[in-house]
């Protein structure tokens, strides 16, 4: 049995927005509200990033066309006592999917938490 950090990515559609900043704010608020309603305050919500195919630069995944925005969101959570990576993925999708019912969730990254001498778990810096 292992402990994992699972990062899921989710596309969030928002309406009646004019700029990508508006879309990001509305999307984060929408997701946080849905997660809090299900008492999932341990799930971290972050903006997704895309990579330019030409120059390789990273930019926020938020696009607005005709007052409708599409925002990529990363959802990070820790899964404890999973039997495998696949099991951790299923648990994470089930937990988050309970709050975001009609949002497709895709695994962006899964990392196993490392145990040091039985004294506890060490979380990589980018997950703190």
Swiss-Prot record:
Q: Which cysteines are joined by disulfide bonds?
A: none
Protein family per UniProt: Belongs to the UPF0212 family.
Q: Which Pfam families match?
A: DUF555
- Family annotation (InterPro entries): UPF0212
Q: What is the lineage of its organism?
A: Archaea, Methanobacteriati, Methanobacteriota, Thermococci, Thermococcales
Q: What is this protein called?
A: UPF0212 protein TGAM_1344
Domain of life, per lineage: Archaea
Where does this protein come from, organism-wise? Thermococcus gammatolerans (strain DSM 15229 / JCM 11827 / EJ3)
């Amino acid at each position: 049995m292992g402990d994992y950090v699972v990062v899921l990515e989710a596309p969030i559609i928002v309406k009646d927005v004019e700029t990508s900043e508006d879309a990001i704010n509305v999307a984060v608020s929408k997701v946080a509200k849905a997660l809090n309603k299900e008492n999932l305050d341990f799930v971290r919500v972050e903006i997704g990033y895309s990579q330019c195919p030409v120059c390789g630069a990273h930019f926020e995944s938020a696009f607005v066309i005709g007052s409708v925005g599409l925002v990529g969101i990363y959802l990070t959570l820790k899964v404890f006592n999973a039997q495998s990576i696949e099991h951790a993925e299923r648990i994470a999708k089930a937990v988050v999917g309970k709050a975001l019912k009609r949002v497709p969730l895709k695994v962006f990254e899964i990392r196993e938490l490392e145990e040091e001498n039985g004294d506890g778990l060490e979380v990589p810096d980018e997950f703190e």
